[in-house]
UniProtKB/Swiss-Prot annotation:
It comes from Coxiella burnetii (strain RSA 493 / Nine Mile phase I). Monomer. This is Glutamate--tRNA ligase 1. It holds the Pfam family Anticodon_2. One of its GO terms (molecular function) is tRNA binding. It catalyses: tRNA(Glu) + L-glutamate + ATP = L-glutamyl-tRNA(Glu) + AMP + diphosphate.
Length: 469
């Protein structure tokens, strides 16, 4: 079997979006399961719109998702001489020609065709004319066949046939000599020996044109697979209005790469009823021919569910660094407080993203300076001062700071003062965290640590006394 070579070829004119990453994932999986090579190519010939920041974001996003590449990144902007060479080759073989049509003529042609309810297309005006010996500006057009059809077996959609009469002579070199997209893509796929082109179905109309250029060059055709687009929950094409669409935005919002990868592979592909896939299972089970031909609808709630699943199941050690980043963004000094792994293990069941986890864990690393007004009014009452003082004294005298011993102190104090456990636990929780929501109170006390816990209880008792005064 021929050595499989796939590629991902984004344009660095914006962020790396969800649709692009899913395409990259499918292409990467196909290469990996066939022991092939995955090539990264940056299509940066649009100099005006391409930015280094976009290139950096693409590379960073792929690395975050651990979509690694065997070759590249190759940059089209560094291959201009090669494109010009191929353009000259096509002109010499009479598979391309100079077109001197003015912009005005082409606009008039288009308007006439639209008026006559015809498909706008170039009419071949310069197709059989000899090159002019003048300095008039010209573009170079590919001489598309006028007979027969382009037929190819799409990996996802099956057999596709396009009549050559539906295709006009596309421009392959602009008036400044710069190559166009359809030319550069063909040359790159040819030179890089790409065997399988897996890309979005917005490129499907380009495929017959590119196949005809490859035929003219005498090149071997790759296999093509066109992945349907992703729709928003409202059924319209996924865009910024649907929320986060940049891959790095998901990272910054506290999603795990494992969750996003798992979610994307299920967008348009399924393996029975299985929802959770390890990276190894993705490589083993993914089948490009089983990808749905219909657009997939993006479901933010499903992604959140998956993210929480991975928060609960991935080792805290693996996500500690990302959690630290979220805490630091919230202005937290991590030198004081429990280990990140301990907090992750405690909070994973209660939060859906690392960002939410960080926001709900600030009190482990910061002193509580104020209380939620409603929580204080309900729980920090004069009647609770004596039980709080008792808890504070008992905690201070514990021989060792262990969860079981802490729990006993709270239970015994509640019984002594004829309180239900919640009637004592909630005031302690407000004292420790400033609010009424936290993990179990004994675990919260344990992680906050004895010294900090005692200070916070003292502060709450003073707060109540001030209110009484």
């Amino acid at each position: 079997m021929k050595h499989i070579r796939t590629r991902f070829a984004p344009s660095p004119t914006g962020y790396l979006h969800i649709g692009g990453v899913r395409t990259a994932l499918f292409s990467w999986l196909f290469a990996r399961q066939n022991n092939g090579a995955f090539i990264l190519r940056i299509e940066d010939t649009d100099v005006a719109r391409s930015t280094q920041a976009s290139v950096d974001a693409i590379l960073e996003g792929l690395r975050w998702l651990q979509i690694d590449w065997n070759e590249g990144p190759y940059y089209q902007s560094q291959r201009m001489d090669r494109y010009r060479e191929v353009i000259e080759q096509l002109v010499k073989s009479d598979d391309a020609y100079r077109c001197y049509c003015s912009k005005e003529r082409l606009i008039e042609l288009r308007n006439t065709q639209l008026k006559n309810k015809q498909k706008p297309r170039y009419d071949g005006f310069c197709r059989d004319k000899a090159p002019r010996q003048s300095n008039e500006p010209f573009v170079i057009r590919f001489r598309n066949p006028v007979e027969g059809a382009v037929v190819f077996d799409d990996l996802i959609r099956g057999t596709i046939s396009i009549d050559n009469r539906e295709l006009d002579d596309l421009i392959i070199a602009r008036s400044d000599g710069g190559p166009t997209y359809n030319l550069t893509v063909v040359v790159d796929d040819w030179d890089m020996k790409i065997t399988h082109v897996i890309r979005g179905d917005d490129h499907i109309n380009n495929t017959p044109r590119q196949i005809n250029i490859l035929h003219a060059l005498g090149a071997e055709l790759p296999h093509y697979g066109h992945v349907p687009m992703i729709l928003g929950p409202d059924g319209k094409r996924l865009s910024k209005r649907h929320g986060a669409v940049s891959v790095l935005q998901y990272r910054d919002e506290g999603y795990l790469p494992e969750a996003l990868m798992n979610y994307l592979i299920r967008l348009g592909w399924a393996h029975g009823d299985q929802e959770i896939f390890s990276r190894e299972e993705m490589v083993q089970l993914f089948d490009i021919s089983a990808v749905s031909r219909s657009p997939a609808a993006f479901n933010p709630e499903k992604l959140l569910w998956l993210n929480q699943h991975y928060l609960k199941t991935v080792s805290p050690t693996i996500i500690a660094e990302a959690f630290a980043t979220q805490l630091e963004k919230a202005g937290t000094d991590l030198r004081n407080g429990p280990s990140l792994e301990q907090v992750i293990a405690l909070q994973a069941e209660r939060t859906k993203t690392l960002k939410e986890m960080a926001q709900r864990s600030l009190y482990f690393y910061q002193e509580v300076r104020s209380y939620d007004e409603k929580a204080a009014r309900k729980h920090l009452l004069a009647t609770i001062v004596e039980p709080l003082q008792r808890v504070r004294e008992r905690l201070a005298s514990l021989p060792s700071w262990e969860k079981e011993a802490i729990h006993e102190v709270i239970v015994e104090t509640a019984q002594l003062h004829q309180l239900k456990l919640g009637q004592l636990a909630q005031p302690i929780r407000v004292a420790l965290t400033g609010d009424t929501v936290s993990p179990p109170i004994d675990a919260t006390l344990y992680l906050i640590g004895r010294d900090s816990a005692l200070k916070r209880l003292d502060h709450a008792i003073r707060f109540i006394h001030q209110g009484m005064g």
